[in-house]
Amino acid sequence: MSILEKVQPIETMLPERYYTMSTEDMEKRVREIKEKMGETLFIPGHHYQKDEVVQFSDAAGDSLQLAQVAASNKDAKYIVFCGVHFMAETADMLTTDDQIVILPDMRAGCSMADMADIEQTERAWKELTKLFGDTMIPLTYVNSTAAIKAFCGRNGGATVTSSNAKQMVSWAFTQKERLVFLPDQHLGRNTAYDLGIPLDKMAVWDPHTDSLEYDGDIEEIQVILWKGHCSVHQNFTVKNIENVRKNHPDMNIIVHPECCYEVVAASDYAGSTKYIIDMIESAPSGSKWAIGTEMNLVNRIIQQHPDKEIVSLNPFMCPCLTMNRIDLPHLLWALETIERGEEINVISVDKQVTEEAVLALNRMLERV
């Protein structure tokens, strides 16, 4: 038995024959199955997916758009989600019991989502309650596990995306005096600062030391940030910005708010994946842009806008490795197992977790 087989069950591993198929043959089979299944099959794809996968998506979008699509689609029996695990979980929780959600590769996870597990979160909430009493409301970025969404749901909180973070943080402060923001400290910090909350009124909870890190007066803390981050956006630096300013002084810099505060502050624009796409789309021909977000998306934007000069803010960036787990062979494999009635990699969230998580999701969806 190989090391991989010990880590991943053999039945969820891609069969050998898919490695030897030509791209043309795989694409032909995907088209055949899509045509055969019609509206009973729905393939949502995240913007960070590879082109070889996105070309077959029935809907492409960011986390908010895909959550809305999942919630509104009642016709498809099979939803083959081309994204990462937490997105497929969200789709399962927002669809009916008769609909089946499949993730083509179960290894497509999210390191940020894994930075906040439920045991750590329950322990943190208990300790923070000792400090602040019943003055807190939890918000979680949708880039989190179903269990964390459920935690927020049963504690009066909600989910957020990078598209609606300002709206949801503003709402949270109408409910409680303080906010606990999971699991991405950078999105939480950038959003709160953008709403006028000074940095010295923000603290960071370290789940590994069970300690609160802060510089100002503890009584004045308004935002408690979970010490988590996106492994992709963490790699954009102020030095990258300085290099662009030096070598291309007329180039606009636009970044995702999962980048650290210093990078966002030094950029010209910051916003969600959809915001970045729309901004470049509406920019005049001949304009110049350095984009600080995932590389698959940056490359796609470059291809779609040959009339504009577009580069990655960090020229040495790699695509999101876990997003890249979903590829054409895994997509075809998932579709062929459906065709045979032998579905693999079915995502099924526990009923109680779903009920509580949907509370958090609906508090978001009804406000956007």
UniProtKB/Swiss-Prot annotation:
Protein's cellular compartments: Cytoplasm
Keyword flag 4Fe-4S: yes
Cofactor(s) the protein requires to work: [4Fe-4S] cluster
Top-rank taxon, per record: Bacteria
EC number: 2.5.1.72
Gene Ontology cellular component list: cytosol
Gene3D superfamilies, alphabetized: NadA-like
Positions bound to [4Fe-4S] cluster: 110, 230, 320
Reaction(s) the record says it catalyses: iminosuccinate + dihydroxyacetone phosphate = quinolinate + phosphate + 2 H2O + H(+)
Binding-site positions, iminosuccinate: 46, 63, 141-143, 162, 256-258, 273
GO biological process, one term: 'de novo' NAD biosynthetic process from L-aspartate
NCBIfam families named in the record: nadA, PRK09375.2-1, PRK09375.2-4
Family: Belongs to the quinolinate synthase family. Type 3 subfamily.
Protein name: Quinolinate synthase
Species per Swiss-Prot/TrEMBL record: Bacillus cereus (strain ZK / E33L)
Gene from which this protein is expressed: nadA
